[in-house]
Amino acid sequence: MNNKKLKRILEVSDDYKQITLPDSRYYQRNGKYYPSVTHVLSHYPKGKYFEDWLKKVGYSSEYIVKKASEDGTKVHNMIELYLNGEEFHFLNEKGIPQYDIEIWKMFLRFVEFWEEYEPTLLETEVHLFSDKLEVAGTCDMVCEINNQLWIVDFKTSNHIHSTYDLQA
């Protein structure tokens, strides 16, 4: 991968140690500790719409968040298989669905993006560090589209959240 393009505020590194604690994750490199972007954003104010949603769903919120995380992991795994050239279908050889229809739809949104923009895949699961922002993290994919470098983190939400741009 051409690392020079990423070095504006990010540096790609394979020389690091990931430290996962019960409520946070840090990356250690060259004697310096970087909090994960996800951990930093967990302290970012969620806003009025999130608060309204919590009031509306009440105790169900834990279940909803857990299911969304599980669904996101399933879609992420499907995308990785797709990027590795694996072929799979919604129906198995007996005509029975192999995937939940909502998970399949989320996966197809990625396929539509991939086919429409025709990116050149450079790397997956890239560990990035920013001395300027003092954070680190792992992006899902680095690719090139129309001669521009893209850092991609797969999302399965139906809405754009205010923290998405902060994660990049």
Residue ranges and their predicted role:
Residues 122-168:
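Mg2+/Mn2+-dependent nuclease catalytic core
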